[in-house]
């Protein structure tokens, strides 16, 4: 089985964190990149030949993959970034389906019987082998993973209409305003998780049909899945049936699309709750990432942290509560950090206050400065989400 990870997304809704990098390369949970979650799921599930399709500002992502995800070449295993190569003419990827069409040489080289096509910017644990087993049993051309979400959230997702058997896909709507609810749960719909398992022949044929359609948007969810649904070749995999070793009742079925600042922030708060909704510390189904060569975190006299994740290399001289700190963060004496996410090498000066904020790497907060204290001033100087999360980009100056 070949794994293809779609990692070329621009991530406009996650600005300014994506101003200098692709969305899958954004830091999450202190030490991880978003792409680490899907790659860990595939590798833990014994899918060991993986191509990561990249395009938008991919240097940070390419470097992370090549320095972190080094598999055993002696066994023919690999995780490799594959940039847009203009194999079908002088054009970049027109959409996720076109990205795979232009990269079909990867499929032809491996000649797998099945292809897993997964997104790169979600936070979750999943054993793809269970989805593959259902796909093989169903005989479908494609199986799409779905998760139940409230109907009110439908405009944010592709919505799957299941058949009476609960497995056949009878319809697909891209971000509908008011879709019908499920027969057994009218308040919910099945949202597509952006994860697909294809029989290779069905995938290749669907991509070529899509390429010949002048009205297509060349998207996996918006084009390929509806096409195969109309042909009666699509099946649904209910994510709630998936189980991984070491999971708890709290994090079983956890999946978050962190494509907006509010969702990104909320997912971090899930990590530091007293009973975390997502457990980063499951050793039976680990999330892998790059190991930094830094000394352990240090707390000086007066340095306090509670309900927080503090990464290696951090120096805490002030007060940190309900926050996630990446490696190398410094919090000086008298400084207060509350409900915030600080990326690598952020420095919070003496007496400064940071509340409800996401600070990208290398941001320097001067002594006595405040973020998250004066809403009017914050709105004039920084990016502020609909939910009130304040975000500063990489290296952004704080007056």
UniProtKB/Swiss-Prot annotation:
Q: Which InterPro entries match?
A: ADP-Glc_PPase (IPR011831), ADP_Glu_pyroP_CS (IPR005836), GlgC_bac (IPR023049), GlmU/GlgC-like_hexapep (IPR056818), NTP_transferase_dom (IPR005835), Nucleotide-diphossugar_trans (IPR029044), Trimer_LpxA-like_sf (IPR011004)
| Keyword Nucleotide-binding annotated | yes
Out of the domains of life, which is the source?
Answer: Bacteria
GO BP: glycogen biosynthetic process
* Catalytic reaction(s) noted: alpha-D-glucose 1-phosphate + ATP + H(+) = ADP-alpha-D-glucose + diphosphate
* Keyword line: ATP-binding, Carbohydrate metabolism, Glycogen biosynthesis, Glycogen metabolism, Nucleotide-binding, Nucleotidyltransferase, Transferase
| Keyword set includes Ribonucleoprotein | no
Q: Which Pfam families match?
A: Hexapep_GlmU (PF24894), NTP_transferase (PF00483)
- Binding-site residues, alpha-D-glucose 1-phosphate: 158, 174-175, 192
User: Which Enzyme Commission numbers does its entry carry?
Assistant: 2.7.7.27
Q: Which family does it belong to?
A: Belongs to the bacterial/plant glucose-1-phosphate adenylyltransferase family.
What's this protein's function? Answer: Involved in the biosynthesis of ADP-glucose, a building block required for the elongation reactions to produce glycogen. Catalyzes the reaction between ATP and alpha-D-glucose 1-phosphate (G1P) to produce pyrophosphate and ADP-Glc.
Q: What is this protein called?
A: Glucose-1-phosphate adenylyltransferase
**Source organism of the structure:** Streptomyces coelicolor (strain ATCC BAA-471 / A3(2) / M145)
Tell me what gene encodes this.
glgC
């Amino acid at each position: 089985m070949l794994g293809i990870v779609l990692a070329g997304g621009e991530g406009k809704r996650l600005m300014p964190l994506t101003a200098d990098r692709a969305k899958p390369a954004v830091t999450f949970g202190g030490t991880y990149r978003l792409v680490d979650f899907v790659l860990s799921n595939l590798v833990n599930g014994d899918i060991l030949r993986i191509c990561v399709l990249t395009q938008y500002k991919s240097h940070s992502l390419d470097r992370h993959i090549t320095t972190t995800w080094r598999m055993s070449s002696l066994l023919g295993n690999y995780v490799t970034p594959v940039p847009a190569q203009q194999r079908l003419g002088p054009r970049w990827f027109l959409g996720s389906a076109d990205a795979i069409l232009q990269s079909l040489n990867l499929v032809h080289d491996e000649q797998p019987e099945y292809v897993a096509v997964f997104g790169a910017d979600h936070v979750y644990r999943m054993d793809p082998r269970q989805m593959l087993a259902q796909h093989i049993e169903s005989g479908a051309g494609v199986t799409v993973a779905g998760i139940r979400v409230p109907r009110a959230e439908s405009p944010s997702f592709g919505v799957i209409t299941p058949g009476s058997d609960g497995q056949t896909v009878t319809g697909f709507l891209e971000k509908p305003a008011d879709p019908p609810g499920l027969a057994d749960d009218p308040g919910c719909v099945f949202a597509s998780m952006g994860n697909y398992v294809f029989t290779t022949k069905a995938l290749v044929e669907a991509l070529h049909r899509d390429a010949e359609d002048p009205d297509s948007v060349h998207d996996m969810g918006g084009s390929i899945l509806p096409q195969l649904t109309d042909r009666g070749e699509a099946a649904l995999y209910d994510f709630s049936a998936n189980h991984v070793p070491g999971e708890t009742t709290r994090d079983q079925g956890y999946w978050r699309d962190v494509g907006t600042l509010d969702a990104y922030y909320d997912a971090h708060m899930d990590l530091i709750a007293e009973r975390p909704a997502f457990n980063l510390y499951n050793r039976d189904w680990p999330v892998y990432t790059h190991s930094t060569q830094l000394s352990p975190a240090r707390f000086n006299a007066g340095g306090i942290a509670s309900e927080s994740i503090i990464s290696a290399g951090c120096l805490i001289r002030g007060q940190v509560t309900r926050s996630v700190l990446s490696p190398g963060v410094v919090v000086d004496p008298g400084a207060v950090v509350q409900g915030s996410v600080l990326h690598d090498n952020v420095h919070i000066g003496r007496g400064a206050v940071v509340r409800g904020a996401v600070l990208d790497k290398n941001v320097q907060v001067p002594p006595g400065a405040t973020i998250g204290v004066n809403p009017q001033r914050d709105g004039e100087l920084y990016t502020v989400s609909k939910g009130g999360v304040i975000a500063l980009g990489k290296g952004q100056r704080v007056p």
